[in-house]
UniProtKB/Swiss-Prot annotation:
Source species, domain of life: Eukaryota
Assigned protein family: Belongs to the RNA polymerase beta chain family.
Zinc finger (C4-type): 1161-1183
Protein name as annotated: DNA-directed RNA polymerase II subunit RPB2
Protein's UniProt keywords contain ATP-binding: no
GO terms of molecular function: DNA binding; DNA-directed RNA polymerase activity; ribonucleoside binding; RNA binding; RNA-directed RNA polymerase activity; zinc ion binding
Length: 1222
């Protein structure tokens, strides 16, 4: 329980290679998985796929630009037509590099990009060929073109630069890929940094996986009462590669249950009305009624379904041939007033290109599309006849996650289109003006560079012009607060539904989420359940080409759809690949077995999913990108005599894995070179990837013991009955096909840190998952060479005493975020009520929970106009306008502050001036001497510290650029926030010195005292078990294993604690620190891991007397950073009204805010009085009134409102009680 490995873990007696594996061995498999995949493999694989294949595909898709220049026939000789053609070929990607302002290029490493605010990107080059054709244009004959010249561009074998693509760190094209640890140290990179993000203008950006519904699947839904449609079947067809161009087809069943004519109509794209389905079938060339019904209803004896189709056949009775049907559809098109032939062609085009485009967009596949439409109607009717439930929108197998690859592909496609359009325009201009066509000038490389950069920098995914329509928040700044918060951010997924939607369904945890997304880690509040996090072992498919699989199916007895005659083969199974119905098969069981064998051998990619629905007689194969899958152990088919089955994985495999791992660490043994990795397991068919769809066709055992039916039933009589032991469910089945590698792998990054999460009430784990991301620790080991905007580093981080096995892969022991505090659970003076706690001041003085805080300030000399720039210098009052009120004395002459200088609020740390253009007046403050204006950066007014580091460099334009880092030590004090790993957060209520704290008989004094009332209502039992286990761990000198779903019991831990001579449940006798008397009750006492959270009282404290005012309303400004006021809001106002405290109310809302004096005319009641206060003369010119004038005090905001109303021709007249009656 406490020790992970014996000392001789790698030394085996030569026992049976074929022995079954133990629970410990499954962790070896998990280690192999993470050693090969890492925690951000989904990001890296997706990006690699994009660079390796997608870009080339997208460029070849739009590869040829053609421009024809027809003969003008102005003179006899002018009868030559020309055709210009430009075609794109192979692409080349350079290494990430940068070009300095003086034109020198060099390789760029990520750290340089971060410090100099550059973009880590690689140049993209493409081969471009130009061809020119000519033809003699003889009227009445077709043109015959001949090539007259063909040239590749000579620049380096015809490679043209078309833009820079940002490179994901640690991907295949990153300079850090496959570097050793020492190389990384040399480049000032942290070896723990896992990559998976981009560097754009110096800031680290992650692409959050975007969840969407999968395309190309038929879904049937019921519609609720007021709608005339009772059921609807819909499919969102999307072409496999490229544009994600989506065309939706809906088949609607009109008429509610029990109504007479329940017709079925379909909504076609670009057609204004719904078209009866029989007409669509006839337009597809299927004329006889019987044949149409055959396409829909596969069983000719199913009279119920045929009965439902009767009204449809009757409805389409009028139209009996293909032409008429096509004309019927064409008439309802968007284009009006066109001839019949045109209409028919229009309808044909729509049926070919827009109707079910995912099947094909070529002509001659009408039969396939007809069968598919029939299948949709069949599904619709099955649901209407209550033989099948409606589809579940929230089924995770019907969702796809778009990662960096698909997201960038979508963007790249748009930008490349734009680029080709520009080239075409340039060609046209060149041809018209008979200029030389220069490719270098035609290709605007900034289109792609700037487009990708903009999307990644702002998170608005789409073109800059259409910023409103595009999705926001796709790219986010990587959270660098703690190492685990970074990891968690890289594995986050987002569902783009409106956050304000009150729909509960998409937010709920669904059964199909098991093992794929974490059940605990989701934010509270408006994004709850919409933002999810991947479980530790889940991966996302990158998408593979379905063609080999389709070829294989055709060879293995799949009959093509065109030859399918339903009534002849009623038992045939329909075969779908990526939602396209390709054909039927008569022996599906054998086919599925064969494909599975191929997949387990590695002949078919492991990420392909194979789903056989026996009841529906369907076989679905998915190879598309964005499916979430996870690995499982495969159970061997052979059944033993006693009915149990074995896992395919045996002790021998585990040994090979361990030897490989040992080689990696120790350098291995000379004699044998074993390289047995996770991939080897996959290719040996020992583990298998299963996605949410396929998971429903298999049976998964939770532990290895479940496979053996003889184990749970027989209770060993020698065991004394342990009341605390976990109760195992008795299985009534032994047809398992798979087994979980370990159930704790259902959790995500943040929840894997929680000890015993299976002993907590579920929302507590969710709270901790959110708080763990705010804990201080060491976010990366190279924090000293980074200039982050903000960074918090704990002085003495400790690894927890109660650990989970998953922490190994989260590197939590190497980069922890907390300390093991000695905690007593007691009231003791009552300064820990309501989630506050008492902390030991002496421990704080020794450095408990101290932290460093770094903040960086950045500035650069900007260009103004062509020649003039701002300059860093120490401004002088003599020649500089608008100087700030902080002190400039700490600056050196170059305008920068030296490291080691102590600074406090509002001190200037970067001095900079801007030249004033000679014609500017500067509000009359300017004298002859003033030639510049101050543009310096002061320290934040509420902070102080020591200047830690100053960096001077130049940016891409070659302008001077500085970053200054200020360092502060934050010592825990009253009001700072802490939390255990169970959602038990609290602030310090008081600190006592050691002599005032209670102590145990051994003289141990706690660091923290928390209130016992924090435990019962919150049911965080794991908090107590962790404390108990940590106590044992501290006494025995081992780490305590607090992983979820193990056989560890409180009794087991209590026994161990007893053996160390302590009270078995962790209680101790304590003495009052003030009086020395024994405390009445025994106190629960032991170490618990606590985290210091980022909310500190020094960053929150705020008060104000008088201060800055808003310009428009003259009310106090808002916000602590601007020294703003405290809002007396509507609710506070209501309380004052309820109390009847009128004078106080007037003081708060007027005197303390924006009191203002106006003069009003007693006659007209308007504020039109001209007041000369010096001479005591007043006059309302409109009324010629000089005597009847009153002075009133009203809020300035009210005066403003009155004036704005007057601007809208509404006259608010103010009357005093002394003005005359109107």
């Amino acid at each position: 329980m406490l020790e992970y490995y014996d000392d001789d873990a790698y030394v085996y007696d030569d026992d049976d290679e074929d022995a079954p594996i133990t629970a410990e061995d499954s962790w070896t498999v998990i280690s192999a998985f993470f050693r090969e995949k890492g925690l951000v493999s989904q990001q890296l694989d997706s990006f690699n796929q994009f660079i390796n294949y997608t870009i080339q595909d997208l460029i070849l898709e739009d590869s040829t630009l053609i421009l024809e220049q027809l003969a003008q026939h102005t003179t006899e000789a002018d009868n030559i037509s020309r055709k210009y053609e430009i075609s794109f070929g192979k692409i080349y990607l350079a290494k990430p590099s940068m070009t300095e302002s003086d034109g020198v290029s060099h390789a760029m490493y990520p750290q340089e990009a971060r410090l100099r605010n550059l973009t880590y990107a690689s140049g993209l080059f493409v081969e471009i060929k130009k061809r020119t054709y000519e033809a003699v244009d003889i009227p009445g004959r077709d043109l015959k073109y001949e090539i007259i010249q063909e040239e590749s561009e000579d620049t380096e074998e015809g490679k043209i630069f078309i833009g820079r693509v940002p490179i994901m760190l640690r991907s295949k094209y990153c300079l850090l890929d496959d570097l050793s640890e020492s190389d990384l140290y040399r480049l000032k990179e942290c070896p723990f940094d896992m990559g998976g993000y981009f560097i754009i203008n110096g800031s680290e950006k992650v692409l959050i996986a975007q969840e969407r519904s999968a395309g190309n699947i038929v879904q049937v839904f019921k519609k609720s009462a007021p709608s005339p449609i009772s059921h609807i079947a819909e499919i969102r067809s999307a072409l496999e590669k490229g544009s994600r161009f989506i065309s939706t087809l809906q088949v609607k069943l009109y008429g509610r249950e029990g109504s007479t004519s329940r017709t079925i109509k379909a909504t076609l794209p670009y057609i204004k009305q719904d078209i009866p389905i029989v007409i669509i079938f006839r337009a597809l060339g299927i004329i006889p009624d019987g044949e149409i019904l055959e396409h829909i209803c596969y069983d000719q004896n199913d009279w119920q379904m045929l009965e439902m189709l009767k009204p449809c056949v009757e409805e389409g009775f009028v139209i009996q041939d293909r032409e008429t049907a096509l004309d019927f559809i064409g008439r309802r098109g968007t284009a009006l007033g066109i001839k019949k032939e045109k209409r028919i062609q229009y309808a044909k085009d729509i049926l070919q290109k827009e109707f079910l485009p995912h099947i094909t967009q070529l002509e001659g596949f009408e039969s396939r599309k007809a069968f598919f439409l029939g299948y949709m109607i069949n599904r619709l009717l099955l649901c209407a006849l209550d033989r099948k439930d409606q589809d579940d929108r929230d089924h995770f197998g019907k969702k796809r996650l778009d990662l960096a690859g698909p997201l960038l592909a979508q963007l790249f496609k748009t930008l490349f289109r734009k680029l080709t359009r520009d080239i075409l325009r340039f060609m046209q201009r060149s041809v018209e003006e008979a200029k030389d066509f220069n490719l270098k000038l035609a290709v605007k490389a900034t289109t792609i560079t700037a487009g990708l950069k903009y999307a990644l920098a702002t998170g608005n995914w789409g073109e800059q012009k259409k910023a409103m329509s595009s999705r926001a928040g796709v790219s986010q700044v990587l959270n660098r607060y703690t190492y685990s918060s970074t990891l968690s951010h890289l594995r986050r997924t987002n569902t783009p539904i409106g956050r304000d939607g009150k729909l509960a369904k998409p937010r709920q945890l669904h059964n199909t989420h098991w093992g794929l997304v974490c059940p605990a880690e989701t934010p509270e509040g408006q994004a709850c359940g919409l933002v999810k996090n991947l479980s530790l072992m889940s991966c996302i498919s990158v998408g593979t080409d379905p063609v080999p699989i389709i070829t294989f199916l055709n060879e293995w007895g799949m009959e093509p759809l065109e030859d399918y005659v339903p009534h002849q083969s009623p038992d045939a199974t329909r075969v779908f690949v990526n939602g396209v119905w390709h054909g039927i098969h008569r022996n599906p069981a054998r086919l599925v077995d064969t494909i599975r064998k191929l997949r387990r051998k590695g002949d078919i990619t492991a990420e392909v999913s194979i789903v056989r629905d026996i009841r529906e007689k369907e076989l679905k194969i998915f190879t598309d990108a964005g499916r979430v899958y996870r690995p499982l152990f495969v159970v061997a088919d052979t059944q033993h005599a006693d009915g149990h089955k074995d896992l395919k994985v045996r002790k021998g495999h585990i040994r090979k894995l361990m030897l490989t791992e040992y080689q990696d660490i120790e350098g291995g043994f000379e004699d044998e070179d074993i390289n047995y990795t996770w991939t080897s397991l996959l290719n040996d068919g020992i583990v298998e990837y299963i996605d949410a769809e396929e998971e429903e066709t298999i049976l998964i055992a939770m532990q290895q013991e479940d496979l053996d039916p003889s184990v749970p039933q027989t209770v060993d009589p020698s065991d004394e009955l342990d009341p605390a032991r976990r109760i195992k469910a008795i299985h009534h089945s032994n047809t398992f096909t798979h087994c979980e590698i370990h159930p704790s792998m259902i959790l995500g990054v943040a929840a894997s840190v929680i000890p015993f999460p299976d002993h907590n009430q579920s929302p507590r784990n969710t709270y901790q998952s959110a708080m763990g991301k705010q804990a201080m620790g060491v976010f990366l080991t190279n924090y000293n060479v980074r200039m982050d905007t903000m960074a918090n580093i704990l002085y003495y981080p400790q690894k927890p005493l109660g650990t989970t096995r998953a922490m190994e892969y989260l590197k939590f022991r190497e980069l922890p975020a907390g300390q093991n505090a000695i905690v007593a659970i007691a009231c003791y003076s009552g300064y820990n009520q309501e989630d506050s706690m008492i902390m030991n001041q002496s421990s704080i003085d020794s450095g408990l929970f101290r932290s460093l805080f770094f903040r960086s300030y950045m500035d650069q000399e900007k260009r103004i106009g062509m020649s003039i720039t701002e300059s860093f210098e120490k401004p002088h009052r003599t020649n500089t306008l608008r100087m700030k009120h902080g002190t400039y004395e700490k600056l050196d002459d170059d305008g920068l502050i030296a490291p080691g200088v102590r600074v406090s609020g509002d001190d200037i740390i970067i001095g900079k001036t801007t030249p004033i253009p000679p014609d500017a007046e500067e509000l009359g403050q300017r004298t002859a001497f003033h030639s510049k204006r101050d543009a310096s950066t002061p320290l934040r007014s509420t902070e102080n510290g020591i200047v830690d580091q100053v960096l001077i460099t130049t940016n891409q334009e070659g302008l001077k650029f500085v970053k200054v880092r200020v360092r502060t030590t934050k010592v825990p004090q009253i009001g700072d926030k802490f939390a255990s790993r169970h959602g038990q957060k609290g602030t310090i209520g008081i600190t006592y010195r050691r002599e005032d704290m209670p102590f145990t008989a051994e003289g141990v004094v706690p660091d923290l005292i928390i209130n016992p009332h924090a435990i019962p209502s919150r049911m965080t039992v794991a908090h107590l078990i962790e404390c108990l286990l940590s106590k044992v761990a501290a006494l025995s000198g081992n780490e305590g294993d607090a992983s979820p779903f193990t056989d560890i019991t409180v009794d087991g831990i209590s026994k161990l604690l007893r053996e160390h001579g302590y009270q078995s449940r962790g209680f101790e006798v304590m003495y009052n620190g003030h009086t020395g008397k024994k405390l009445m009750a025994q106190i629960f006492f032991g170490p618990t891991y606590y985290q210091r959270l980022r909310h500190m009282v020094d960053d929150k404290i705020h008060a104000r007397a008088r201060g800055p005012m808003q310009v428009l309303t003259r009310q106090p400004v808002e916000g602590r950073s601007r020294d703003g006021g405290l809002r007396f809001g509507e609710m506070e106002r209501d309380c004052m009204i309820a109390h009847g405290a009128a004078a106080f109310l007037k003081e708060r809302l007027m005197e303390a805010s924006d009191a203002f004096r106006v003069h009003i005319c007693g006659i007209c009641g308007l504020m039109t009085v001209v007041a000369k206060l010096k001479h005591n003369q007043f006059e309302c010119r409109g009324c010629k009134n000089k005597i009847d004038i009153y002075q009133v005090h009203i809020p300035y905001a009210a005066k403003l409102l009155f004036q704005e109303l007057m601007a809208m021709n509404i006259a608010p007249r103010l009357y005093t009680d002394r003005s005359r009656d109107f």
